[in-house]
């Protein structure tokens, strides 16, 4: 198959019928859940992937998961699934293909982690699960979720592969049956290199997952890597795709990798902003940003804060300034060596520092539960990226606060697009400040 042009895509079906599923009375959030069923050969596919119409569960115990998984879920303190988990897990554990859009913090990662672990029957030396994501930190985080939920499944081995590290170490791990993983979490470039050099065998893969699928598939080079990896896996497998944002343009591309998929869209496109997240802007001059930031860090109550800037240089300079001003801060950006980025991510996650200055490398999918304040020191240029940024605060249905600095006509234009795109009113931050109870959990 040629690699030239966007039409070089794997495609299983052109003729789909959408069936609306009643998703009312879940909670206060509106849920738009649709099931797409292939018209031709639907019976065969349904038998193969599992029948899913009308299946609903209200507690994790209702999913009838393996005892080892149920025990790990209890250890994590989870009892009731989120909207996306409630709609998706009952079908995904039976092998149904999934295309899922749900806003940040609703537990999409747990959907595919629990579903693949439920189906996993580990065989020494065989890779059964492949998870692809666009960022190294996200790959590391997903691996940790697998470790957390497989803690009572001692035979299950998980590995993470990403660029910036010696590929020889990956090869050594893969060729040894004692260390070879059953679950592989990887970025597309490194996994393609392992496939190309015949260092990994994907002929036994049963579950193929793409997290942040819009970001992975919208870039042609990354999409081509995914296609090459996809071709190295069996045709008969489960495919699941997840993202917080899923435009109408990218959905057909995603569907070409899927067979008879369950499609879940939690909240429609205009309501993707986070429940419980207070959002404000502050209009100021560029040279006023540092003073205003220091004032906010002094005045606001927060557990951890992430401050987004537009470049590596600004991240380094702002972090230096904050530390000199007695605001101990850590910085994370894409120009760091991989080991350093991971070490700093871990340090921030483990609460060694309360303030993190970052470029958009932390703008997608990163879960750090203590973050309840996000500040756009430099406002993003894209509305969708705004959602991913502010989604770092107020995750898992908790409260949070997002403040954006607006310092140019371009920023004002972007702010308008954000409000229009997500049908949300972002108010000006009051001079007297705000009540901490509006953005802090009790």
From Swiss-Prot:
Keywords: ATP-binding, Helicase, Hydrolase, mRNA processing, mRNA splicing, mRNA transport, Nucleotide-binding, Nucleus, RNA-binding, Spliceosome, Transport. Gene3D superfamilies: P-loop containing nucleotide triphosphate hydrolases. PROSITE patterns: HELICASE_ATP_BIND_1, HELICASE_CTER, Q_MOTIF. InterPro entries: DEAD/DEAH_box_helicase_dom, Helicase_ATP-bd, Helicase_C-like, P-loop_NTPase, RNA_helicase_DEAD_Q_motif. A motif (Q motif) lies at residues 58-86. One of its GO terms (cellular component) is spliceosomal complex. Residues 292-437 form the Helicase C-terminal domain. Its main location: nucleus. It holds the Pfam family Helicase_C. One of its GO terms (molecular function) is ATP hydrolysis activity. ATP binds at residues 102-109. Residues 89-264 form the Helicase ATP-binding domain. The keyword Nucleus applies. A motif (DECD box) lies at residues 211-214. The Q motif is unique to and characteristic of the DEAD box family of RNA helicases and controls ATP binding and hydrolysis. ATP-binding RNA helicase involved in transcription elongation and required for the export of mRNA out of the nucleus. SUB2 also plays a role in pre-mRNA splicing and spliceosome assembly. May be involved in rDNA and telomeric silencing, and maintenance of genome integrity. PANTHER family: ATP-DEPENDENT RNA HELICASE DBP3 (PTHR47958). Belongs to the DEAD box helicase family. DECD subfamily. This is ATP-dependent RNA helicase SUB2-2. It comes from Vanderwaltozyma polyspora (strain ATCC 22028 / DSM 70294 / BCRC 21397 / CBS 2163 / NBRC 10782 / NRRL Y-8283 / UCD 57-17) (Kluyveromyces polysporus). The gene is SUB2-2.
């Amino acid at each position: 198959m040629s690699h030239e042009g966007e039409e070089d895509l794997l495609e299983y079906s052109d003729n789909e019928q959408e069936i609306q599923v009643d998703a009312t009375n879940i909670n206060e959030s509106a849920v738009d859940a649709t099931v797409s069923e292939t018209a031709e050969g639907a019976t065969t596919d349904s038998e193969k992937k599992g029948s899913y119409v009308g299946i609903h569960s209200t507690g994790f115990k209702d999913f009838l998961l393996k005892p080892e998984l149920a025990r790990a879920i209890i250890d994590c303190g989870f009892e009731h699934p989120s909207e996306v988990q409630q709609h998706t897990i009952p079908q995904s554990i039976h092998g149904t293909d999934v295309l899922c859009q749900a806003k940040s913090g609703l537990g999409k990662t747990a959907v595919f982690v629990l579903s693949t672990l439920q189906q996993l029957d580990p065989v020494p030396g065989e890779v059964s699960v492949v998870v692809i994501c666009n960022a190294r930190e996200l790959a590391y985080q997903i691996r940790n979720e697998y470790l957390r939920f497989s803690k009572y499944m001692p035979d299950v081995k998980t590995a993470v592969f990403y660029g910036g590290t010696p590929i020889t170490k990956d090869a050594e791990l893969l060729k040894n049956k004692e260390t070879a993983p059953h679950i592989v979490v990887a970025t597309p470039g490194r996994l393609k290199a392992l496939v190309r050099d015949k260092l990994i065998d994907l002929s036994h893969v049963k579950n193929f997952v793409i997290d942040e699928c819009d970001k992975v598939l919208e870039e042609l080079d990354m999409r081509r890597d995914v296609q090459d990896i996809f071709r190295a896996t069996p045709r008969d497998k489960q495919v699941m795709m997840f993202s917080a944002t899923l435009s109408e343009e990218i959905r057909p591309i995603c569907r070409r990798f899927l067979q008879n998929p369950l499609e879940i869209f939690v909240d429609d496109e205009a309501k993707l902003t986070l429940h419980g997240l207070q959002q404000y802007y502050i209009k100021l001059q560029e040279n006023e940003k540092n003073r205003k930031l220091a004032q906010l860090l002094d005045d606001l109550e927060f557990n951890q804060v992430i401050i987004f800037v537009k470049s590596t240089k600004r991240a380094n300079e702002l972090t230096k300034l904050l530390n000199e001003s007695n605001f101990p801060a850590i910085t994370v950006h894409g120009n760091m060596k991989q080991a350093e980025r991971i070490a700093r991510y871990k340090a921030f996650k483990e609460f060694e520092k309360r303030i993190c200055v970052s470029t958009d490398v932390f703008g997608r999918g990163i879960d750090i539960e203590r973050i309840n304040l996000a500040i756009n020191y430099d406002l993003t240029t894209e509305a969708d990226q705004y959602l991913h940024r502010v989604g770092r605060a107020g995750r898992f249905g908790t409260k949070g606060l997002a403040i954006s600095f607006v310092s140019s006509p371009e920023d004002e234009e972007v702010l308008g697009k954000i409000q229009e795109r997500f049908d949300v009113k972002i108010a000006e931050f009051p001079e007297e400040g705000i009540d901490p109870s509006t953005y802090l959990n009790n």
